Regions:
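Structural preference for long, well-ordered alpha-helical segments in enzyme cores
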Residues: 40, 56, 60-61, 70, ...
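Catalytic-core regions built around general acid/base machinery
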Residues: 111-114, 143-151
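A short, well-structured catalytic beta-strand-centered motif of the EAL phosphodiesterase domain
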Residues: 3-58, 78, 176-178
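EAL-family c-di-GMP phosphodiesterase catalytic domain
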Residues: 15, 24-31, 43-49, 98-105, ...
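PAS and PAS-like sensory modules
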Residues: 2-6, 92-94, 235
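Catalytic core of bacterial c-di-GMP phosphodiesterases, primarily the EAL and HD-GYP domains
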Residues: 29-39, 45, 64-140, 216
Length: 261
């Protein structure tokens, strides 16, 4: 099952009404002038019909070597969806790539072929690296990412601020975005140490010409602090619950459409 969750530009939503954000934050993209990003979230459905979190099934899939196949399936779905959008659409999708896929040369060939054959504007596709495990060989990962960047694909370093997504990865990996790890965002209102750390991360990322996405935003106070701090975008249940991809009228997001930079 594929769900999607909005990643909202802070410039568009910092003065928004809290009730509107809680109701359907993604609709605020309609009045925005920038890129409208959505993260694709994969969920398994159990025999009882309940959704199973990636924290449960991803480690199992990694152990049995299934993650490259799962990643390829999700990428295929993303490309098919993007191919249905108008040429002037502002919508971009972010898709998680597993460590196993980053180390697999055959996956690189298959993904490159899928992208080249899709006919989509490749900058609309953003791969997030490092969700649940440490990036294995930085050399292999960098080579993988550089090959896809030549096709126009962009990359985000996920969970930045954890032991796995470290500052050294900004030196070695060709990324365009950093996503600040959610536990640092969740405690912003109580922890001056976390506020200092997040502010430093934002400054570092911008000095490297990277955009900053804050994850797990759960209050209006946190949202406005992040906007004042200079973070570029925010994501979290406060801004929009994950919904099925087909439930969102993405064509409505072509209002005041601009090209994806």
């Amino acid at each position: 099952l594929l769900l999607t969750q909005p990643i909202l530009p802070l410039a568009d939503i910092r003065n928004a009404d809290e009730a509107a954000l809680r109701a359907q934050g993604w609709r605020l993209h309609q009045s925005g002038t920038g890129e409208a990003l959505f993260e694709l979230l994969i969920r398994m459905v159990g025999r009882d019909g309940q959704l199973i979190s990636p924290s449960v099934f991803v480690p199992l899939a990694e152990r049995v070597g299934m993650m490259p196949k799962i990643d390829l399936w999700v990428i295929g779905r993303a490309l098919r969806f993007l191919s249905t959008l108008p040429a002037n659409s502002r919508v971009g999708l972010t898709v998680n790539l597993s460590n196993a896929t980053l180390q697999d040369s055959e996956s690189l060939k298959l993904i490159s072929g899928m992208i080249e054959g899709s006919g989509v504007l490749t900058s609309r596709l953003i791969f997030e690296v490092t969700e649940t495990s440490e990036i294995g060989s930085l050399h292999s990962a960098r080579k993988f990412m550089q090959s896809l960047r030549k096709l126009g694909v962009r990359f985000a370093l996920d969970d930045f601020g954890t032991g796995f997504s470290s500052i050294s990865h900004l030196k070695h990996l060709p990324v365009d975005f950093v996503k600040i790890e959610g536990s640092l965002i969740t405690d912003l209102t109580e922890s001056s140490r976390d506020r200092t750390m997040v502010a430093s991360m934002v400054s570092l990322a911008h000095a490297l010409d990277l955009k900053v996405i804050a994850e797990h935003v759960d209050s209006m106070h946190t949202l406005r602090w992040l906007a004042d701090c200079g973070a570029d975008s925010a994501q979290g249940h406060f801004l929009g619950e994950p919904v099925r991809l087909e439930e969102i009228d993405f064509r409505a997001l072509n209002v005041a459409a601009v090209g994806v930079s």
